[in-house]
Design a protein with these regions (language model features):
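Formylglycine-dependent sulfatase
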Residues: 1-407
Length: 407
């Protein structure tokens, strides 16, 4: 009876808030948005919550994050493009002191605040500054300060304001972020169970590089062998069947710079790129499942508002061989060698199968064209392919209208 009474009491309190963001994930990359990729945990939230068909971001990593956290146009925050200094006004590339974050506001109103994931709101990534998460309202932080990096040996991995403990042999960033987020919920429940919390969980997945454990990649072997043309058609039909788009909406033409699948010579390598990307998305979903399990275990699930979105559409960037060979010191994205001393093969090379720590590749325009089905263009562009994102909201005791919201 005590546990039932405790759960009932908690249900009447202010809701906890968990805000989850994917990185460079396309509109149709979740199962509940028509994908072949397995995302059971997000699909479950969508089934019991609300999915939006017309939710938008700002088409780039940093501006989307700045707007999400402040409620402002990105230029007002100082993040007009990315985190390099492009001049005065809205382009200094660092979140300024003329805005407040949702963490600062909620913290002032009695919420515990925590962040686990990718920050990417300042170019000063190696030394703490007033633009770091711990100085913008988050009481605790674990993640990367920069905008990208290895999933096995992430550069700028930070706990609080100090370099985090070195990754062990089993380290995989997406999974670790899920564990760290669940750990925050567990520790908070023990320390201050009556206090609501705000947890910001911006994953780096599935942003390049294409990194995923081989055992997960293998589970997608053959799934993408029919190629991007056929798979775009299938996703388009599933989006119609799911009532996310109108059946009068045609599928956009294949990008003019993408060759027909029937003309592709290196199909095995191309399929491998998408297999790895799919593994990254599924592992993010699994990490979200870890967080959901902890919410249920602590009795907080029903009174937690969970929101999920992506920062922009699928990314068409092709990483040329040697693209990051000219590294700053200290490096921003990746180290030249793995922890075992193996040289990292940087760039998209059809002789190198992506996935392992000694690779650094992207899935490129052909597969981004699939990710953004049914739309044109990609991250960077303000066409629908760049700015349309899945959005899922779930709050069992809140007054959310379930189903698909087209408004």
């Amino acid at each position: 009876m005590n546990s039932v009474s405790s759960a009932s009491t908690r249900s009447r309190r202010r809701p906890n808030v968990v805000l989850i963001m994917a990185d460079d994930m396309g509109y149709s990359d979740l199962g509940c948005y028509g994908s072949e990729i397995r995302t059971p945990h997000l699909d479950g939230l969508a089934a019991d919550g609300v999915r939006m068909s017309q939710f938008y971001n700002t088409a780039r990593c940093s501006p989307a994050r700045a707007s999400l956290l402040t409620g402002l146009h990105p230029h007002q925050t100082g993040i007009g493009v990315l985190t390099h200094d492009d001049g005065p006004g809205g382009y200094p590339g660092t979140i300024n002191d003329r805005c407040v974050t949702i963490a600062e506001v909620l913290g002032d109103h009695g919420y515990a605040t925590a962040m686990r994931g990718k920050w990417h709101l300042t170019g000063r990534v190696h030394e703490p500054s007033d633009a770091w998460p711990t100085r913008r309202g988050f009481e605790s932080f674990y993640g990367i300060v920069a905008g990208a990096g290895s999933y096995y040996q992430p550069v700028t991995l930070t706990r609080g304001e100090e370099p985090a403990e070195p990754p062990d042999d089993d380290f995989y960033l997406t999974s670790r972020l899920g564990d760290e987020a669940a750990g925050f919920i567990r520790d908070h429940d023990l320390a201050d169970p009556d206090k609501p919390f705000f947890l910001y969980l911006p994953f780096t997945a599935p942003h390049w590089p294409l990194h995923a454990p081989e055992e997960m990649i293998k589970t997608y072997r053959g799934v993408f062998d029919d190629g991007w043309d056929e798979l775009r058609e299938r996703r388009h039909q599933r989006l119609i069947d799911l009532e996310l788009i109108n059946d009068k909406w045609p599928l956009s033409e294949r990008d003019s710079e993408v060759v027909a699948w029937d003309e592709v010579a290196d199909r095995d390598w191309q399929a491998r790129r998408m297999e790895t990307y799919a593994a990254q998305v599924e592992l993010m979903d699994a990490a979200i499942g870890t967080v959901l399990d902890e919410l249920r275990r602590t009795g907080r699930f029903d009174n937690t508002l969970i929101m999920f979105l992506s920062d922009n559409g699928g990314c068409a960037e092709e990483i040329p061989p040697g693209w990051v060979d000219e590294l700053p010191n200290p490096p921003l994205h990746t180290r030249p060698r793995t922890s075992t001393g193996e040289r990292v093969r940087r760039g998209n090379d059809s002789t190198v199968r992506p996935g392992g720590p000694a690779t650094y590749a992207s899935y490129g325009k052909p597969w981004a064209n699939l990710s953004n089905t049914p739309f044109r263009e990609y991250k960077h562009w303000v066409h629908e392919g760049g700015i349309a994102t899945p959005f899922i909201a779930h709050w069992p005791i809140g007054e959310l209208r379930s189903g698909v919201d087209h408004d």
